[in-house]
């Protein structure tokens, strides 16, 4: 190993060490001066570290898949204010510890937008965690039963952005709703939540099994927040119609009906 590679390794500049020979060749061909070469070399190291950090944060985020805002079909959901989405993509809401609430029926793109904003936050260096509500509640209930609730709440507070998906698909009892409130209260004005729900705010009292508690939950969520109410057709139904599985006159069973009939998985 050459002395230069040894020094770079000692400085823990692994990416630069790996590419240094090719960078030296480029510098010679382009006749770069010392400052230009140094900038190019440091940029190479930064790019490598950024990519490695993003891959690590994406893994820790537990996203079910990676979606971007560039992949979102705004033409299919023209009711969404693109200006608001662009502002959210700037992540000022994260810096201000504000929340984003995405409402709408199943399949309109709520989770896609939530994940895309999460990916933006990961790219910016923030710690993100994605959890469907049922998994969150199960995690909190187990922690409470094992007398480690405070520690679990603290662990969930480490995420700069917490994405809570599928609020409203299944009702909660009062104990579960109370645990949910404790989490919101812990994060209030300290870290951001991105939340998706198929229920309008008027239905949250029934959903949480306690209208007073639902009011307190909404108070914490809405105090500093941006709400997008998405009204439109389901992307999934559109694809099924394109494939000929459904006709335009077909009325598919809704997720709420599936829950009531016991068919929801």
From Swiss-Prot:
Record-level GO BP terms: DNA replication
CDD domains, sorted: AAA
Entries under Pfam families matching the protein: IstB_IS21
Coiled-coil spans in chain: none
Domain of life: Bacteria
Ligand binding (ATP): 104-111
GO molecular function, one term: ATP hydrolysis activity
Keywords from the UniProt entry: ATP-binding, Nucleotide-binding, Plasmid, Transposable element
Matching InterPro entries: AAA+_ATPase (IPR003593), ClpA/B (IPR001270), DNAC/IstB-like (IPR028350), IstB (IPR047661), IstB_ATP-bd (IPR002611), P-loop_NTPase (IPR027417)
The UniProt record lists the keyword Transport: no
Role of this protein: One of two proteins expressed only when there is a tandem repeat of the IS21 insertion sequence, it is necessary for the transposition of plasmids with that tandem repeat.
Family from the record: Belongs to the IS21/IS1162 putative ATP-binding protein family.
Protein's name in the database: Insertion sequence IS21 putative ATP-binding protein
């Amino acid at each position: 190993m050459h002395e230069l590679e040894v020094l770079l390794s000692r400085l823990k500049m692994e990416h630069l060490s790996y590419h240094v020979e090719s960078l030296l060749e480029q510098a010679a061909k382009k006749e770069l001066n010392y400052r230009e070469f140094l900038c190019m070399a440091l940029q190479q190291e930064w790019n490598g570290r950024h990519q490695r950090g993003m891959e690590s944060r994406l893994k820790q985020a537990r996203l079910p898949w990676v979606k971007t805002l560039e992949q979102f079909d705004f033409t299919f959901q023209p009711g969404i204010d693109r200006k608001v989405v662009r502002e959210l993509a700037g992540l000022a809401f994260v810096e201000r510890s504000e929340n984003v609430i995405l409402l709408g029926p199943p399949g309109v793109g709520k989770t896609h937008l939530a994940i895309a904003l999460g990916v933006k936050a990961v790219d910016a260096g923030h710690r993100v965690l994605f959890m469907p509500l049922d998994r969150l509640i199960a995690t909190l209930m187990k922690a409470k039963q094992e007398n480690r609730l405070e520690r679990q709440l603290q662990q969930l507070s480490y995420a700069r952005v917490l994405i809570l998906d599928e609020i409203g698909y299944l009702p909660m009892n009062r104990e579960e709703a109370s645990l949910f409130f404790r989490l919101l209260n812990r994060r209030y004005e300290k870290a951001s939540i991105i939340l998706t729900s198929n229920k309008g705010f008027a239905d949250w009292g029934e959903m949480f099994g306690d209208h007073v508690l639902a009011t307190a939950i909404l108070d914490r969520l809405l105090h500093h927040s941006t709400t997008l109410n998405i009204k439109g057709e389901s992307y999934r139904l559109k694809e099924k119609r394109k494939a000929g599985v459904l006709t335009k006159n077909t009325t598919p069973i809704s997720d709420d009906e599936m829950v009531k009939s016991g068919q929801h998985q």
